Amino acid sequence: MPLSTGLTLSSLNVMEKADNHYNMMTKQPPALSPVDMVSSRRGFNPIAFTPWPVTILSSLVYLAFIIPIIVVHHLVPPAPKESPEGVDLKEAWHDLQHLTRQYHPYNSHSNDEVHQWLLKRIHAISASSSARSGDTTGPDIFIFDDNQTNLTFSSVGVAAKSITGVYFESKNILVYIRGAEDDQEEWWESPDGEPSGKGGVLVNAHYDSVSTGYGATDNGVGVISTLQLLKYFTTPGHYPRKGLVLLFNDGEEDFLNGAYAFSQHPLSKFTHTFLNIEGAGAGGRAVLFRSTDTEVTRFYGNTEHPFGTVLARDAFQLGFIRSETDYHVFDGVFGMRGLDVAFMEPRSRYHTDQDDARHTSIDSVWHMLSAAIKTTEGLVSYTGDAFDGDNGNDGKLNNGAGTLGVWFDFYGSSFAVFELNTLFGHSVALLVVAPLLLIATCVTLYTLDKMYMFSMYTYLSESGGQVSLYGLRGLFRFPLILGISTALTIGLAFLLMKANPFIIYSSPYAVWNPSALHRAYAFTWMFGMMWVLLVIATVYQKQHGIASSYFIVFYFAGVSIATWISYLELFGLPTTQDYARRQIRITDRTPSSDSRLLAPSADELPPSGSAAGHDFNPEDVEDEEPTESTSLLRGQQRTTFANYASARSNSDGNISTNASLHPKDHRLEQRWSINLISSAWILQFLFVAPIVIILLGQLGLFLTSATYQIGADGGSQLVIYVGIAVLSVLILLPLFPFIHRFTYHIPTFLLFVLIGTLVYNLTAFPFSHSNRLKVAFVQEIDLETGKNQASLVGVEPYIHDIVRTIPSTTGKEVSCISRGYGGRAKCSWDGLKPRVVDAPYKEWITYNISQAKDDKHTRFEISGKNTRACKILFDSPIADFKVLGSVTDERIPHTGPKGVSEIRLWSRTWENTWTVDVEWTKKNANRQGKVMCIWSDDNDLKVIPALDEIRNFAPAWAAITKLRDGLVEGSHSFKL
């Protein structure tokens, strides 16, 4: 809703009144527009450039396009009442409820239960599919419970933080549905086996949740959608032509571990394309987040309700979105080509206890499932060569080379996909052709003596007499008011950032800011402004592969056409010479103190059928009632060449303002404007407004949904507010050339809306039960000293309000620090003792450190009770490490140029003992750090009392999530 509309319209009204005052003082000739002639002689014109048609039609067009965009964005298409062939929605919903009964992170006993349940469901679906088909022509189904694979790798290329080494043991489940055209041999049984023929398709969904969320959308819906894909593609009539691999991976939440482990499975050499289904919200529509190329994106376009824009991919590429999904591994490590489809809002429920089945719907399930079915069906049915062949990437799959693409949906029902090179080509063409076309039009107008724009005067060729054209009037009004209104809009963004920065968290649409500008020269200024933006966009398209500037191409195209129409209108005007002659004759017949009481000569009369629109008739100017100042010889006035100076003076003087010929709406415009086409404005408006509303409206809503709650994670709120302010101006910009024709009703209404929303935004509390502020929990214990600190990390000042409600902080010192937490503060206090291990602190971890004889290597042996996740942290980075029994992959380096500062150890076995050999750097004089184990299972009450206490006593507007992999961290310090 508008925040700055009232301010903008006020500035517009001031400018308009000042301009009108100037016109009256200078006695500018009034305009007589064709619509006035039509209105007075032929009746009402419903599309004339007059206040009511402009107000009504413009408002209807905006409402007609904006309302459906908002509805589509927020309402999920309903699921069918009867399940389509090959799927069972009731079964899917029941599976989701079962899957999300408990938190099930990798480091929890419930994760093992989910693993076993998935195996049973997969076997049951496979068995029922065989029984259902009743024939032997169905595809072969192979189920792999991967409890053998392990891998050592590092965080290089995953996050821009300190280098972290990882050892992980797989608990992945894979299902291979053999395609009709696949190799019929079980090639994976051979150690050196290689698939033959065309590559297959991978569908991936991770089945672990975070320790503080039930994982309904992250990633329960993805898991049960993948189960339904198994049912669908083993149903007669839907058998795949190319092989389909369904990967249920474990450990995604902790470091994309399951996807990395898949690299060691033989089937990773078979899949050339992929679909990753994920969740970063808690319901709504599933969004196409990313795609590797144009060719694979076209298969997503087959879905019934596509939803997404290339803006998301560019945000990942530019680093605005810092979180990662398994897409990163499949694309970056394997070189597969595919798609990333995920839920994205509301972020306030993401990774919290509200990510449950209660807060999603069967409609959301169907939206993701239907997209997965159509996309996968297209991929497994494709038999071309687009995804096969050498691509020049050594060490990666030979799956052909794709082209960068551009994509966006239209109202969630159709999908546009084309190559970035196509966008670049059109951008260059528009940059060249549009200015040349306008220049050619201007040259033609000058040649025909009809270029009224940019001209203040014209001079009669036969006498040198000067007549005012007022062609420069309003030239600088557009940039002036654009600058003022934009500054006010952005100023309000800074005001909100200062006074109530998190109001967008619960009220994202209360901060949207429309603007209004005047029409004079507006399209010409818009043309120049959009041309500059298109130049910048074209450079980024070519040099950085940024495709989300596609809206600028369409925007500029529409503005170019509208601007050209404005120039084409000038061809309907008389030449400036004819206009000047007529003005002098009319002026000579107008009473003034220095009028000559002479009649015009014959050669001074305008030609018959002149461009002025009708033959000249002296009676045309004798429509006023005689007064005491009326000349007695009014019809006999004439001007000689000697009197052109006085004629020129009077051309700026008193002119008849008979209301029947000069309605009040146009009385102050240039007289020559009577020949402009009154209804041309509607063409200009329709060329610009609809496409801008659709493209920028969808982009604006997408951007708002993706970012309005990132402030809880330490993201900059100012960037969001300024972004919304800029989008507001761009979306309302098509109204600027016409806004002066609006009646006062809409500006007045929006002024009141401005006042109301501004007061609300400055005073309302930004959080609520449905839009909770996320704060992150961790409990850190020094197992040697027994020091026990519970901590919450969140944005200030609200984190202090939350901490004060916790009973165990009463009368105790609470320490808060803000450095190193990305715009958030960490508040710590003496916490309640956890019961994750039924033993004294010193017995929670068993470890041994032995120094090698060369003084360059050290062996660590570490094990923790009731856990399968431990760490070794070093105060100074080490050069290298090796976990006994592990493998490495040259595609995935396990160390980096600056060494490793942390080693994370994950085992599928509880209370496992890891043996880690560490190589120190030459500079490692300070060989000290910590051995640590973590506990993440919070399904049993009273296991982590400090967390239970926070959940019980924190305000209803606060939500608890995890800070790191473990909810409880126990550590011993070491120094060598």
From Swiss-Prot:
Cellular localisation: Vacuole membrane
Enzyme class: hydrolase
Vacuolar domain ranges by topology: 73-399, 449-477, 541-550, 697-718, 767-976
One Pfam family matching this protein: Peptidase_M28
Residues covered by region (Disordered): 590-633
Family annotation (Gene3D superfamilies): Zn peptidases
Active site as annotated: 252
Membrane topology: Multi-pass membrane protein
Site (Transition state stabilizer): 350
Binding site for Zn(2+) 1: 206, 218, 278
Enzyme Commission number(s) of this protein: 3.4.-.-
Keywords: Glycoprotein, Hydrolase, Membrane, Metal-binding, Metalloprotease, Protease, Transmembrane, Transmembrane helix, Vacuole, Zinc
Details of cofactor binding: Binds 2 Zn(2+) ions per subunit.
Glycosylation sites: 147, 150, 848
Cofactors (names): Zn(2+)
Transmembrane regions: 52-72, 400-420, 428-448, 478-498, 520-540, 551-571, 676-696, 719-739, 746-766
Binding locations of Zn(2+) 2: 218, 253, 351
Top-rank lineage group of the source organism: Eukaryota
Record keyword Glycoprotein present: yes
GO molecular-function term, one example from the UniProt record: metalloexopeptidase activity
GO BP terms in the entry: proteolysis
Spans within the Cytoplasmic topological domain: 1-51, 421-427, 499-519, 572-675, 740-745
Family: Belongs to the peptidase M28 family.
Record protein name field: Vacuolar membrane protease
Taxonomic lineage from the root: Eukaryota, Fungi, Dikarya, Ascomycota, Pezizomycotina
